[in-house]
Regions:
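Bacterial N-terminal signal peptides that target proteins for export
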Residues: 1-9
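Bacterial N-terminal signal peptides
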Residues: 9-18
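Phosphate-group recognition and catalysis centered on beta-loop-alpha active-site segments
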Residues: 23-315
Length: 315
């Protein structure tokens, strides 16, 4: 090989490497790539947003759940997904609120179904998970339209739709041009048709929530039924026993569908532990989940889970 030929080959190789590097997704595209790749590693879902303190990123105090402040914090710390709750107010406005009343999370009282957006805008959100003793903040009840606008291009949203308003919610998502930035989920039992192939769920990323009837359901059969002529992105696992997991993992691998679990509170898989256990020993809880086939984890401790994921990726 002549020097000129060698130089040409080297230049071509460098150009190819540069092209490959420049093609690597970044920002929300990287999150989308991670979510839709069953081998894409752990996906971090922040439950009701990043409302807990995140001292490693300069957030020493709590933020209200389901608030714009909780969303901004999720973006700042690098969470992949913010889970947030959607309900309909009396005037039809879609708003981000977990409970059917405003009592726990605001300085007001009453049923959301009896309050208009004008009523809601007068209320202040309470810090963190709320309650009568939680401090009031300057944050207000957020509309779905506001949540979509602020998250666009930055983070995925996992919408927990609390009322029978799926069509209205997905229509709002479509108007915002965010069909590939939003996850919607709905419960599925053994007799439920494959929801991911049905309107409006086929317009967004969709997760069936598997129903564990009486705690003894054949969850693998439920999951398999949801893959017939349909391709959900993930199955969300219910509260279940550890013995029910291996068959679900087999189904998920056979159909290239991820498994999502909550590590909230005591955790949703008996014997695996929850967030408090994971913050003490992340490998024992989150690591075990990941090794056993679960790759999407919803948590109230997103900063700690992100730290643990980073440690895995550095190994």
């Amino acid at each position: 090989m002549t020097l000129r030929t060698a130089a040409t080959v080297a230049a071509m190789l460098c150009a190819a490497l540069a092209t490959h590097a420049s093609a690597a997704p970044t920002g929300v595209a990287a999150i989308q790539a991670r979510l839709t790749n069953p081998d894409g590693g752990i996906v971090v879902v922040a439950h009701r947003g990043c409302h807990a303190p995140a001292p490693e990123h300069g957030f020493k105090d709590s933020a209200p759940e389901n608030s714009l402040a909780a969303l901004e914090r999720c973006i700042a710390i690098g969470a992949d997904v913010m889970e947030t709750d959607v309900r309909r107010a009396a005037d039809g406005t879609l708003v981000m609120l977990h409970d059917a009343t405003v009592d726990r999370t605001t300085d007001g009282t009453g049923k959301l179904s009896e309050l208009t957006l004008t009523d809601l805008q007068k209320l202040r959100l309470r810090s963190d998970e709320g309650g009568a003793q939680a401090p009031l903040t300057d944050q207000r009840v957020v509309t779905l339209e506001q949540m979509l606008a602020r998250s666009k291009g930055h983070i995925l949203l996992n919408l927990d739709v609390k009322d029978a308003i799926y069509v209205q919610v997905v229509d709002a998502v479509a108007r915002a041009g965010m069909q590939h930035q939003v996850i919607v989920k709905a419960e599925a039992g053994i007799a439920t048709p494959p929801l991911a192939a049905m309107l409006p769920f086929d317009k967004v990323y969709f997760f069936p929530i598997l129903i564990n009837a009486h705690g003894t359901a054949d969850l693998a059969a439920v999951a398999t039924a949801q893959t017939r002529n349909a391709h959900p992105v993930a199955f969300e696992l219910p509260k279940m026993t550890a013995a029910q997991l291996p068959a679900l993992v087999a189904v998920s691998k056979a159909h290239n569908v991820r498994l999502m679990v909550n590590s909230l509170w005591e955790g949703f898989i008996a014997g695996y532990g929850g967030d408090a256990d994971a913050e003490r020993d992340p490998d024992k809880v989150w690591g075990r989940m990941h090794r056993d086939g679960i790759s999407i984890i919803q948590t109230d401790a997103p900063e700690a889970l992100l730290r643990y994921r980073a440690s895995l990726e550095q190994r």
